[in-house]
């Protein structure tokens, strides 16, 4: 049950007052009245002389958005706190949700207008894996932001298998090959090696699987008649809601997990576990969350959808501008109970350009959370195809699909057309710099091998990519009765 105190209400009145203040400042300057001497700069999300006038024809102005208590919900919190929703004439209510399934179901049922979603959720829903519904995304919320944590006991067993730097600290990135002997030891003792991830179609599931497989540990297959994801598995992965990860680890129910922040850093602060790798080290600048809405909502409310996307773009710009200068304020906002509700020091440990592995081993990781730079907010088709490829790799997509299917599905869900229309309007209004957006892209990023195993990924050739991966289903394979069939 979500209490009223956990719900954040937004009113356009603040935006009206802000707009009035901006207008007054402009009039004073034009009339030779008081002004402040300040260096000129390119338009930014948080400081602009442009007067924001809500778009005409908003189909809906009262909206409710859902989120899970993770730091990467930040664009929603900032769009609210900085009045960017209000600038668009939108009354927004933000509501934390109990888990990812509840969040998705409430978007589908129309109880939520949209939500902070796992990147795989709109894709899985659209192809009918789990609840069937056509969900689209006009906005990618962030890059990176996750980590994999193991218990202290497991870490002590892994540590001899990890090379050290001259100062004695472990060398990163840490391969899952260091974990493999530990998993084998547990198996020999008759103990299943249980690990947690947040949802079957979560980034965390696919990142954890990718890391394990790259180190020779089989994370298991799915099949139409067995959705546990544990067929032929060396490590048994199961769902645990993000805020419950540390407690579940401490209880010994799981030996490790993959989750977003602040729940890896929480394990460090509590002294119950050690984050061994970040997803930045698994796949550099990987897409993480998206903002999801139903296709019906986007079709029936195009002006409102554009206005929401504008507000979220401005929030992302604010989060990354001036070399993350606003992150300390963002941490203070996110620490509030109505948002993430974790200790500010815990959130700051990853949100402000550092990441702590073992207690005291804090390292510079400036791109652990990226919200705008590197075109983080653009919904790339190639990102969608990667998630679909992982669904196929592990059997969630049970049958072979040709490359054209992957492309068509990506285009059905990812909506860069909406994103670019919103971005262009911000540029036209003097609120954004045209150079910050990828106008000429076809939606596919260049081929990259920035993965922990060095395997190259070309979003235009998903089947060739699947064939190149050592562990996982190949193009012609399927899973039935617990066996891989050619």
Task: Give names to the regions the model predicted.
Residues 385-486:
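Conserved C-terminal helix/tail region of periplasmic/extracytoplasmic solute-binding proteins
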Residues 27-30:
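C-terminal motif of bacterial Sec signal peptides marking the signal peptidase cleavage site
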Residues 32-35:
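Bacterial signal peptide processing site
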Residues 47-238, 250-285:
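Short, glycine-/small- and polar/acidic-enriched structural segments
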